[in-house]
């Protein structure tokens, strides 16, 4: 089926290229493990060689494009960009990714990243000279075992897509394993079942997206030390595990191409929802990028909405088109119908984190379940949440009691308890001085929710606490 779709897309591209110039050319983003993607990957390697040689003041350079996502607050004696040593020297459009806690990220995360990698794609297309270049994706959510291995060019130490500050086993050609593999196997089907846009956007961000960022940089155990050439520090968080440096690892783009692919699969499904102009205006974000000629482009909410459902590319197994049957997203605060305050520390690999009863007067089919957490330092690894799990039964991600996996990628981004929160996007802090993160699950409405957390990777010494549980109305 996939080969048939790819063939049809290729035929469509051929016919498009032979039509009038007014018609939009369509590009095909391909699986980075496929033979069909080899020319695009080579073009990307060629482009990154050129982009890495450009100065960081050039908007089409590797450094500038990566810094649009984020860049460290301070880099004393910056060896890669002498004109940037601290946050007062930020250049136009730098530090604009949607890793904030303002609430606006719950609508803009997927949309902003779609626009971001689309502009990088255009720059690579022109820089490489490959006129039909499309950004390859790393399809680690596929069921093929080969797709669990990082694609070869990104592992080749002689290529310009290679980065040393990654999990050693990935660079050595070993497949994703352990907690991260469990997360992919269990979470992907769960994500595709979500019917609420805000919850889908947030869940994909905090599970597969964040989980893979952490795994690529640090693995399941977070016990490897790597030198990060961007921050110029040695730590146990590789380049991809740190929001401030993630965009500098070339695998970032193949990773986010796959996240965008998941987004489109959901949009095309019966569960997909679309945002409106009013919703974008009510949750403003900077959509500020550079085109392939290095020209600054600022997009209004109207322009963003006109583009995001009418992109000029498809995936080799997904057509990127507007789903005319999709419903409108319900964006905004939803009424809390029940609250519980377990205030329990997560000190065991597996333990109960509380019980919350539904409101007896609530008659909706679904509710939104929120788990409020606090911690001193960002927890590593992955955690799995189970609902009404039978005592003595193994914890498996294909169990009907599995709610989902959570990661804490970026949870300490902009920590206001020290001098790191100088550029905005500050992490929230609890009354007792701890960092905070809230996870949301879309669940069926039942009488009682007994919740269990299972740590499938990482360590236990992070002072993680579940403070509060809430149930919210699924509808506005």
Regions found by a protein language model. Name each.
Residues 1-2, 29:
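Generic cytosolic/nucleocytoplasmic N-terminal low-complexity/intrinsically disordered segments
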Residues 2-8:
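Sec-dependent signal peptide recognition
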Residues 11-12:
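Repetitive helical segments and hydrophobic/amphipathic motifs
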Residues 19-476:
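Intrinsically disordered, flexible peripheral segments
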Residues 15-17:
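C-terminal motif of bacterial Sec signal peptides marking the signal peptidase cleavage site
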């Amino acid at each position: 089926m996939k080969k048939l779709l790819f063939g049809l897309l290729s035929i469509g591209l051929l016919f498009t290229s032979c039509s009038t110039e007014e018609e939009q050319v369509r590009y095909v983003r391909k699986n980075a493990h496929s033979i069909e993607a080899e020319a695009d990957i080579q073009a990307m390697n060629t482009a990154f060689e050129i982009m890495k040689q450009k100065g960081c003041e050039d908007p089409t350079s590797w450094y500038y494009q990566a810094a649009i996502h984020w860049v460290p607050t301070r880099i004393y004696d910056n060896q890669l960009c002498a004109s940037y040593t601290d946050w007062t020297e930020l250049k136009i459009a730098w530090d604009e990714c949607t890793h904030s806690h303002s609430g606006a990220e719950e609508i803009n995360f997927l949309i902003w990243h779609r626009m971001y990698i689309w502009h990088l794609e255009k720059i690579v297309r022109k820089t490489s000279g490959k006129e039909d270049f499309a950004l390859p994706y790393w399809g680690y959510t596929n069921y093929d075992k080969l797709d669990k291995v990082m694609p070869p060019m990104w592992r080749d130490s002689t290529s310009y897509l290679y980065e040393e500050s990654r999990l050693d086993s990935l660079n050595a050609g070993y497949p994703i394993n352990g907690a991260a593999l469990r997360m992919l196997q269990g979470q992907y089907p769960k994500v595709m079942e979500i019917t609420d846009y805000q919850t889908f956007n947030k869940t994909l961000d905090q599970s597969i997206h964040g989980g893979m960022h952490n795994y690529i940089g640090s693995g399941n155990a977070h016990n490897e030390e790597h030198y990060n050439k961007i921050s110029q520090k040695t730590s146990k968080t590789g380049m991809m595990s740190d929001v401030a440096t993630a965009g500098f690892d070339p695998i970032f783009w193949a990773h986010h191409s796959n996240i965008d692919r998941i987004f489109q699969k959901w949009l095309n499904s019966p569960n997909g929802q679309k945002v409106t102009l009013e919703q974008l205006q009510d949750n403003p974000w900077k959509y500020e990028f550079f085109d392939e000629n290095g020209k600054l482009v600022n997009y209004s909410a109207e322009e963003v909405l006109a583009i995001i459902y009418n992109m000029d590319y498809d995936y080799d197994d997904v057509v990127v088109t507007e789903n005319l049957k999709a419903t409108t997203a319900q964006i905004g605060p939803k009424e809390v119908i029940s609250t519980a305050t377990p205030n329990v520390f997560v000190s065991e690999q597996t333990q109960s984190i509380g019980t919350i009863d539904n409101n007896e007067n609530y008659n909706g089919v679904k509710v939104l379940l929120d788990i409020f957490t606090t911690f001193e330092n960002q927890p590593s690894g992955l955690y799995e949440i189970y609902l009404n799990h039978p005592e003595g039964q193994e914890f498996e991600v294909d169990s009907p009691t599995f709610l989902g996996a959570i990661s804490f990628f970026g949870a300490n981004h902009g920590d206001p308890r020290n001098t790191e929160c100088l550029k905005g996007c500050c992490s929230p802090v609890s009354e007792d001085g701890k960092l905070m993160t809230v996870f949301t699950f879309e669940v069926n409405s039942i009488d009682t929710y007994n919740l269990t957390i299972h740590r499938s990777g990482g360590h236990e010494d992070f002072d993680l606490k579940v403070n509060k549980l809430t149930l919210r109305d699924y509808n506005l």
